[in-house]
């Protein structure tokens, strides 16, 4: 599978567009090819890790949830596919597309952690691509079960919702005023059910995917191609 930026870089975009096929069909074909590639990759990865776990540790619980994990992984990754596709269509460079998406991912994860834990404004991270806000169930982050709200965690959160539908996730920040050296004081901010986290992350992921794909399609439809 070659990306749109790869077609521009290699020059194959010219004969490709010369074929009696619309640009919309070509664009949708690239998206479909990316989806199939992800589906095959994740299926093989999950099958490999599951088989390894069975061979090493014996029978495992909740294997019936593997399709849910696969579906969640696809949802989470498609948003990054859309970002790469948009950057590649805009700049016609695979390098810029890949490094740009990687930079966005690193920025949202690193800066997001600081914003959430220290500033207590982690709710913002729920509405941008990445790992999202960090919360916990059953106590502060040091003793509770960690839960992240972002689009990167749709699969794990779907499984958490199926196994623990009554979970309430609490978000915390470090109280810098009252914390002593080596002993952080965690201040609870707000709580929301795991069902709301799952619903919000899916809606956010789909919204970004649709908008980014629409922009990419618009740019590709109007791109000037010269031999």
Residue ranges: model-predicted function:
Residues 11, 57-58, 191:
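Short loop/turn hinge sites at secondary-structure boundaries
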Residues 106-219:
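Terminal transmembrane helical anchor/hairpin motif
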Residues 2-35:
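Helix-loop-helix units of permease transmembrane domains in multi-pass membrane transporters
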Residues 15, 46-50, 222:
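Hydrophobic alpha-helical segments at protein termini of multi-pass membrane proteins
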Residues 226-227:
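Transmembrane alpha-helical segments of polytopic membrane transport and secretion proteins
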Residues 27-100, 109, 116-117, 131-142:
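Secretory targeting signals
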Residues 65, 82, 98, 102, ...:
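Generic recognition of short, well-ordered alpha-helical interface segments
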Residues 1-7, 31, 68-96, 101-115, ...:
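Hydrophobic alpha-helical transmembrane segments of membrane proteins
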């Amino acid at each position: 599978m070659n990306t749109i930026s790869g077609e521009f870089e290699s020059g194959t975009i010219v004969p490709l567009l010369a074929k009696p096929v619309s640009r919309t069909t070509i664009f949708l074909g690239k998206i479909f090819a990316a989806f199939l590639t992800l589906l095959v990759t994740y299926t093989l990865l999950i099958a490999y890790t599951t088989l390894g776990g069975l061979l090493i540790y014996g029978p495992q619980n909740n294997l019936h949830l593997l399709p849910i994990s696969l579906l969640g992984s696809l949802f989470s990754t498609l948003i990054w596919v859309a970002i790469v596709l948009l950057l590649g269509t805009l700049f016609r460079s695979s390098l810029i597309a890949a490094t740009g998406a990687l930079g966005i991912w690193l920025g949202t994860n690193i800066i997001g952690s600081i914003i959430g834990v220290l500033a207590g404004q982690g709710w913002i991270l729920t509405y941008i691509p990445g790992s999202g806000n960090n919360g916990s169930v059953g106590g502060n982050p040091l003793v509770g079960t960690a839960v992240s709200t972002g689009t990167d965690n749709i699969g794990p959160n779907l499984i958490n919702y199926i196994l623990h539908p009554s979970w309430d996730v609490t978000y915390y920040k470090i109280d810098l005023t009252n914390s002593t050296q080596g002993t952080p004081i965690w201040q609870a901010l707000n709580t929301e059910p795991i069902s709301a986290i799952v619903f919000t992350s899916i809606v956010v992921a789909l919204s970004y995917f649709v908008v980014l794909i629409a922009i990419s399609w618009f740019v590709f439809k109007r791109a000037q191609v010269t031999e």
